[in-house]
């Protein structure tokens, strides 16, 4: 109890004594004396009760310690009055009152003798009153608070959340918070209260408090009658429960709703799941019919609390009943006070026992539900007004259920569409069958849903009072009854540290509850009788007794009697029966009962909850995210808006980017950056809005997938100034790369394409190759090193702002595979033996060409000798490594040049390939707007081949500085593969216009190239004179493909190994280049041809590094393209070795591929993989199968030549490796100029790695050779170059 209240109690015990003039009189112990005694009691009781009720009103409308003390004082005075008058009545009439001839007098004297808490000694009485006051305050001041300090009151905050939120998490937070805040602190106090209350009523001759409460109903069969009524109503409830459970299943899914189990208690629109009408919107039978919830109309019409009470008053007066007295309007609390007072918001009607002061206390909000509550409370006051001239002892309902029923009877009329139309809240009252079902279901959600709750609360309390439910089982028994009768369960685990009954007002408020169950039966009996008096014809649910004086007269007779007659007699006078009966209720709901049974039969619903013990899981991340939007329809509207606006914004940026990439000028760069900023603003605006949704329980996976994708803002998450800096860095790095040139002493300058690329591809002059290789790295990579460091910082910051540990973690997340890195490593190890054999064979050929001075047969290969600037593809040195020079060589370049092929002819040929498969031809915009040759007008352009989607579903282009050769013909097919993918998924939402994973996009074109590059296909398009099918030709062909595909694999793997380590900090800024060459040595077996240092930045000499393009996609694509190829060849009916397959003109293969491409990013990539290959995993099996003949040949050849697999002389370089400079304390290590201590440490590390590497390589090579015909299986994801 409050400390201040404790100090006041000794004083209160004195002031609680009755004032002079209020004591019982001396009167004769006769029936005549009893008449005088009863008269004196009545006038005195009015004084005492007025004081007690006034004190209680003051406390309930201003919860302060002082008011609590005054309430306790007034309660003590009332109890002293009850005690003194009761004991006097017992003394004078205890032996004779039952023999009185006047039945009214008999009832009055009998009730005066029931003392209740007044039986208790003063100290216990004080304790009893204080417990009730404390419990009242705990309940009324309970709040649910958030981490940010915001707190919710029950009214209106929590009630609104329970009524309107559809967020599983938010509802759970409100439900759990309220039960913990309001219920748990009451547990010990309630146990004390039960002990004291039982003690008090046992002194009046009752077994316990429950027995006393039941005595008001004056029926020896009361409990049996209730059970009989409940059994009558149960089938209707079970059908309603099953229907509602199915609708909640549709909304929340199988995770949270079990169609054979109880319903989680927080999902039914009300804190106690006692009425379900607030979730009517989730289960409207006929949504196209007029909405019966007139809340919005009330708000729009400017209704306020006072007007709602005036409308209710007018209903009563229209029946010829009494209007509210002036005191009602002057003294009622009809709204929650705005002055900060703590009040008891629970709606209640008050009789001050002076026959003129009647009030309502309600924190009214303008809603339809509250309009009914207003009528309910006004019904109580009308009852008070009608029986105010009865003796105090008879100022009550005929039984407690009568009082509750009166206002609700009025609500049955008020809620009809015809009445709502009469008072201007509905434009029309359509009464067709569908509208009737809508109306009746809404009423059932209020009335029928309530019945088991109304029944069980006092079942629980009667068991508590009787001791059948001991304190150790308070909460267990509560939830047992709630599941047994209501078919609901707690949404979180509850135990005996909780006290969930206390979270319902009537428990701490000590208000018996069975009255509400009784009233829900009686109100329909009353309604039927009053409708008959009003001459209503038609179904009972359409009756409105508004303005019927006849109905009013019948009602008045019930009200005026108060409790002066038995309720059975009053009920009989109104209805013609003296028993409670569910017949009228069942008649009222008859149409919807039939409809519910039909609906449940259609969906084969289980009635009841046989899986009694089922409980829902706790939501992931709970209680985080409770304020997020969970309305799926709202999410769909948002995504529709996003899609249409994104198409415009993305198109504008892509156009500007195209202009810049095809004409590198400062102006075009500025425009591109401006459009990029606009796109970033759009991304961040919609990304932040997307983050406001919690899609975890959405039923449409597409909506969830897009929202999750949108929520990742990428670079747009950066502050605007840093975003501008980031974009400028990327633009500057890409520009530096694109305009870089290598100049000779005679001032002749060479761009990368086509000059340097041609030198690397065709020259066999060691020094000329070295000039191009070193010159390119000096001109490109070295110049962007400092910018790259800042780029890494900003990239990581953006990743962290998106919820990732670093940028590498974000890049890997695009593959939606937790084991992605492990899967890649497993794939690489499967493929490594093939690479090692190819490396050893090529190294021998280069040794034969360049000699021991430049090549070590046990060391790495100098990186500039492999025909490509980055040694990623070795196909340009095929002439040096050709296994059988006299056999047919597959090279279409001479024929292309001889036949006068042009870049456009190359693209047209590629288009023919795709259309031969039944795929989509290139649209006209493609031919009109693509840049397929390097412009001859001197413009600086980005030559790196790329395919472009302009996001308007019609404009797709390729930018390529095409050269007429076979290599570029393959590249053309690759880029056209991207465009075909664009065309296939162009009707997907913009968020899904992407590959199933980044590797898929890269693989599609290359799959075509695997067919295009076959001798059979080249012959069919007249680029090869003949197709020679023998082992030597096959090995030549497979070698040409392996120099492109297999040689690429370690490079495709290591590029992002390096970047991921840069992003996560494992590679520091001062070792960028050293670690780059460590990886190139480890995986590719390459070394730099000249010394390198940290002044160089060789990673930056590769386009994808300055351009910020992730690279692992290419490794992924090189694996999965063979899986695709194998599956498409099977669909095309190919027989024979996989490397001879050409799917040209196979519509079956085309359909398989097209169906997968149409998905875009709309499904996780394994589903697209399943569509094409029939299984969901990445695997190297198809690749190994494709190259099996070559692998067999390489192993044999290398064995014959005594080749060493790997590069055990890892520190060998083609220049002096032991050049020391004592003055600078540096050494040359792996081509790097580093400190001597670093070099020593590095040497030991690499020695250990080399030994492991050598042993592993030999083991894998032997293992593969001995079991090469076995399948290679793995799982993962992949891409291209």
Swiss-Prot record:
Where's the active site on this chain?
377 (proton acceptor 1), 506 (proton donor 1), 975 (proton acceptor 2), 1104 (proton donor 2)
Q: Give the residue spans that cross the bilayer.
A: 1242-1262
Q: How does the protein's chain sit in the membrane according to the entry?
A: Single-pass type I membrane protein
Binding-site residues, chloride 1: 217, 515
Q: Which residues bind Zn(2+) 2?
A: 974, 978, 1002
Q: Where does chloride 2 bind?
A: 777, 1076, 1080
Site residues by UniProt (Cleavage): 1152-1153, 1218-1219
Cofactor(s) needed for function: Zn(2+); chloride
Record's keyword terms, sorted: Carboxypeptidase, Cell membrane, Cytoplasm, Disulfide bond, Glycoprotein, Hydrolase, Membrane, Metal-binding, Metalloprotease, Phosphoprotein, Protease, Repeat, Signal, Transmembrane, Transmembrane helix, Zinc
Q: Which sites bind Zn(2+) 1? A: 376, 380, 404
| Location of the Peptidase M2 domain | 28-610, 629-1208
The reply on keyword Metal-binding is yes
Residues glycosylated per entry: 42, 62, 80, 99, 148, 304, 495, 535, 573, 601, 643, 663, 746, 1177
The UniProt entry, under InterPro entries, shows:
Peptidase_M2 (IPR001548)
According to the record, how does the cofactor bind? Binds 2 Zn(2+) ions per subunit.
Q: Which family does it belong to?
A: Belongs to the peptidase M2 family.
Q: What is the protein's name according to its record?
A: Angiotensin-converting enzyme
This protein's encoding gene: ACE
């Amino acid at each position: 109890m409050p400390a201040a209240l404790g100090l006041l109690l000794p004083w209160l015990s004195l002031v609680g004594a009755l004032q002079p003039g209020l004591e019982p009189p001396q009167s004769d112990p006769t029936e005549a004396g009893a008449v005088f005694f009863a008269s004196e009691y009545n006038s005195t009781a009015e004084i005492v009760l007025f004081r007690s009720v006034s004190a209680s009103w003051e406390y309930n409308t201003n919860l302060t310690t002082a008011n609590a003390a005054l309430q306790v004082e007034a309660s003590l005075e009332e109890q002293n009055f009850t005690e003194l008058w009761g004991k006097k009545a017992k003394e004078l009439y205890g032996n004779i009152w039952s023999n009185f001839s006047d039945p009214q007098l008999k009832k009055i004297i009998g009730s005066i003798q029931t003392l209740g808490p007044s039986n208790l000694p003063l100290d216990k009485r004080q304790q009893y009153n204080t417990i009730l006051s404390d419990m009242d305050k705990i309940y009324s001041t309970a709040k649910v608070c958030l981490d940010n300090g915001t707190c919710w009151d029950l009214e209106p905050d929590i009630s609104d959340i329970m009524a309107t939120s559809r967020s599983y998490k938010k509802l759970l937070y409100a439900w759990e918070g309220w039960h913990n805040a309001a219920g748990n602190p009451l547990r010990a106090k309630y146990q004390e209260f039960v002990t004291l209350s039982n003690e008090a009523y046992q002194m009046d001759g009752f077994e316990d408090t429950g027995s006393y409460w039941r005595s008001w109903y004056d029926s020896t069969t009361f409990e049996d009658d209730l059970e009989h009524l409940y059994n009558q109503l149960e089938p209707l409830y079970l059908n309603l429960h099953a229907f509602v459970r199915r609708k909640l299943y549709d909304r929340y899914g199988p995770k949270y709703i079990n169609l054979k189990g109880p319903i989680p208690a927080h999902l039914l629109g009300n804190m106690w799941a006692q009425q379900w009408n607030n979730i009517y919107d989730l289960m409207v039978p006929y949504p196209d019919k007029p909405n019966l919830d007139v809340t919005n109309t009330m708000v729009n019409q400017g209704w306020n609390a006072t007007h709602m009470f005036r409308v209710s008053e007018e209903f009563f007066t229209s029946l010829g009943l009494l209007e509210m007295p002036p005191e009602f309007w002057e003294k009622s609390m009809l709204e929650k006070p705005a002055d900060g007072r703590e009040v008891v918001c629970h709606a209640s009607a008050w009789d001050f026992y002076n026959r003129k002061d009647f009030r309502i206390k309600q924190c009214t909000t303008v809603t339809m539900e509250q309009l009914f509550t207003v009528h309910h409370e006004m019904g109580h006051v009308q009852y008070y007004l009608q029986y105010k001239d009865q003796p105090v002892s008879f100022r009550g309902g005929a039984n407690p259920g009568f009082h509750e029923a009166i206002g609700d009877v009025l609500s049955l009329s008020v809620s009809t569409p015809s009445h709502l139309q009469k008072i201007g809240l509905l434009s029309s009252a359509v009464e067709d069958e569908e509208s009737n079902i809508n109306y009746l279901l809404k009423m059932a959600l209020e009335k029928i849903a309530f019945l088991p709750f109304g029944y069980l609360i006092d079942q629980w309390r009667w068991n508590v009072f009787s001791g059948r439910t001991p304190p150790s089982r308070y909460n267990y028994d509560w939830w047992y009854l709630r599941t047994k009768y209501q078919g609901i369960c707690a949404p979180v685990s509850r135990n005996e540290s909780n006290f969930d009954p206390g979270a319902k007002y009537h428990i701490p408020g000590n208000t018996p509850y069975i009255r509400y169950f009784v009233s829900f039966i009686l109100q329909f009996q009353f309604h039927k009788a009053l409708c008959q008096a009003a001459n209503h014809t038609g179904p009972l649910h359409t009756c409105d007794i508004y303005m019927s004086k006849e109905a009013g007269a019948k009602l008045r007779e019930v009200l005026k009697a108060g409790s002066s007659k038995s309720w059975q007699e009053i009920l009989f006078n109104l209805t013609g029966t003296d028993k409670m009966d569910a017949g009228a209720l069942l008649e009222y709901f008859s149409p919807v009962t039939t409809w519910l049974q039909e609906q449940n039969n259609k969906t084969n619903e289980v009635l009841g909850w046989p899986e009694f013990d089922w409980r829902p899981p706790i939501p992931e991340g709970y209680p985080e995210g409770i304020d997020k939007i969970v309305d799926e329809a709202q999410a769909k509207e948002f995504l529709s808006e996003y899609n249409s606006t994104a198409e415009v914004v993305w198109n504008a940026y892509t156009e500007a980017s195209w202009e810049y990439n095809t004409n590198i000028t400062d102006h075009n760069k500025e425009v591109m950056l401006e459009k990029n900023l606009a796109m970033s603003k759009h991304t961040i605006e919609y990304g932040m809005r997307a983050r406001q949704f919690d899609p975890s329980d959405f039923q449409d996976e597409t909506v969830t997938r897009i929202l999750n994708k949108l929520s990742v803002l990428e670079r747009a998450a950066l502050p605007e100034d840093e975003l501008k800096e980031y974009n400028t860095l990327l633009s500057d790095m890409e520009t530096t790369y694109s305009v870089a040139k290598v100049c000779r002493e005679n001032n002749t300058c060479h761009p990368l394409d086509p000059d340097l690329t041609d030198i690397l591809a065709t020259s066999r002059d060691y020094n000329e190759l070295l000039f191009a290789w070193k010159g390119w790295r000096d001109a490109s990579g070295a110049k962007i090193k400092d910018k790259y460091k800042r780029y890494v910082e900003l990239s990581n910051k953006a990743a962290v702002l998106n919820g990732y540990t670093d940028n590498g973690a974000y890049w890997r997340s695009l593959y939606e595979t937790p084991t992605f890195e492990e899967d890649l490593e497993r794939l690489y190890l499967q493929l490594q033996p093939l690479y090692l054999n190819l490396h050893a064979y090529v190294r021998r050929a280069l040794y034969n060409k360049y000699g021991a001075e430049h090549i070590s047969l046990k060391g790495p290969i100098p990186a500039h000798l492999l025909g490509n600037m980055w040694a990623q593809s070795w196909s340009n040195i095929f002439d040096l490594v050709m296994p059988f020079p006299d056999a047919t060589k597959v090279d279409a370049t001479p024929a292309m040049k001889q036949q006068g092929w042009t870049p456009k002819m190359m693209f047209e040929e590629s288009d023919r390939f795709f259309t031969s498969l039944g795929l989509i031809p290139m649209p006209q915009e493609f031919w009109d707007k693509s840049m397929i040759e390097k412009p001859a007008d001197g413009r600086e352009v980005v030559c790196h081949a790329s395919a472009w989607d302009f996001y308007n579903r019609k404009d797709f282009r390729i930018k390529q500085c095409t050269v007429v050769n076979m290599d570029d013909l393959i590249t053309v097919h690759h880029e056209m593969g991207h465009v075909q993918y664009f065309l296939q998924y162009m009707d997907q939402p913009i968020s899904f216009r992407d590959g199933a994973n980044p590797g898929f996009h890269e693989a599609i074109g290359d799959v075509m190239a695997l067919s295009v590059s076959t001798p059979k296909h080249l012959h069919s398009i007249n680029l090869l004179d003949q197709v020679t099918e023998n082992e030597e030709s096959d090995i030549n062909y497979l070698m040409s493909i392996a120099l492109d595909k297999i040689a690429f694999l370690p490079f495709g793997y290591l590029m992002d190994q390096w970047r991921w380590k840069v992003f996560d900090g494992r590679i520091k800024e001062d070792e960028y280049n050293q670690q780059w060459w460590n990886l190139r040595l480890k995986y590719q077996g390459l070394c730099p041809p000249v010394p390198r240092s940290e002044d160089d930045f060789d990673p930056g000499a590769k386009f994808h590094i300055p351009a910020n393009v992730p690279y692992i996609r290419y490794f992924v694509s090189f694996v999965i393209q063979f899986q695709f190829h194998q599956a498409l060849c099977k669909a095309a009916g190919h027989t024979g070795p996989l490397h001879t397959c050409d799917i040209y003109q196979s519509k079956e293969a085309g359909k398989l591929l097209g169906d997968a491409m149409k998905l875009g990013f709309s499904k996780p990539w394994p589903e697209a993989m399943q569509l094409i290959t029939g299984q969901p995993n990445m695997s190297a099996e198809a690749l190994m199968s494709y190259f099996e003949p070559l692998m067999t040949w390489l192993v044999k050849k290398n064995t014959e030549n005594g080749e060493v697999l790997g590069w055990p002389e890892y520190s060998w370089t083609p220049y002096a490796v032991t050049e020391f400079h004592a003055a600078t304390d540096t050494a040359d290590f792996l081509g790097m100029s580093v400190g001597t201590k670093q070099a020593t440490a590095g040497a030991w590390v690499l020695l250990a790695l080399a030994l492991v590497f050598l042993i592993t390589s030999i083991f894998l090579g032997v293992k593969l050779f001995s079991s090469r015909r076995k399948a290679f299986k793995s799982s993962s994801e992949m891409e291209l170059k």
